[in-house]
Amino acid sequence: MKFGIVINTSRERAITLARELMAWLTEHGQDYVFDTESALRLQTARTAPIEELNKQCDAFVSLGGDGTLLFTSHYSVTKPVIGINVGYLGFLTEFSPDEMVPAIEKVLSGNYSIHNRSQLEATFRTDGKIEQLRALNDVVIEKGTYPRIPTFVIKLDGELLGSYRADGIIIATSTGSTAYSMSAGGPIIAPKSSVFVITPICPHMLTVRPIVINDEKIIEVSIDAPDGEFPLNGDGHLRKLLAPQETVTVKKSQQVINLVANENRDYCEILRTKLLWGREHDSTQ
């Protein structure tokens, strides 16, 4: 089996783990390749452009935090992804560093299960050409440096949902509900729920609240403003600066992300641990 390995090159712990993984895979007769940036940091000749890894590899290993896993997921397509948490929260990265080798062994033996995670697909135009982006967590349209409050017009299946005067709009999957959407006041949604959540960012309207919709709905968002440029982001990466009245169409992608599951993890325990639920505030700090 051949593994594509993507690491957060800014984390020394991830570098150390990558070297340990290289040694283990070599010892056990398994092949591997790194994306170009990771290979340069590790000074290894086993490298390929990250766009080519999916064609060359049977599975992916992400060494970093949730951001590294999101980055990896954009290129893994249908291949299984083993997420090793070397970050902070680790909602998506299923395994700790100590669980790295056992996770690899499970994949090699074929004795593993998969979490299928839905993605968003956003369609827009650039220079007259239709472009698409896929996002595991969220698609965000925001006001950027625009000095006033724009109006975001949202339609569901062609019917007007509402016009939101706000700093931006977040459209999140159930997976992404614990990311930017949660920080903006959106609900936590259980993974694999067949819904999306639309969360306004700092709405200038007291009655506006996030709304949860069926993930079969087609969402259209346009910006009503006299001028300005408005960033369109997918999973935290800028994809385009939108013009006023330009429309972005968001729907469920046909492609899912296959995350190798850690059967020792419990989602309720993750919420309690990561979000510090039920813990007393330490008054000494």
Swiss-Prot record:
Reactions accelerated catalytically: NAD(+) + ATP = ADP + NADP(+) + H(+)
Alphabetical list of Pfam families matching this protein: NAD_kinase, NAD_kinase_C
Q: Provide the leader sequence positions.
A: none
**For this UniProt entry, what is the primary localization, expressed as one broad class?**
cytoplasm
Q: Does the keyword Magnesium apply?
A: no
Any single GO CC term annotated in Swiss-Prot or TrEMBL for this entry = cytoplasm
- Protein name (Swiss-Prot/TrEMBL): NAD kinase
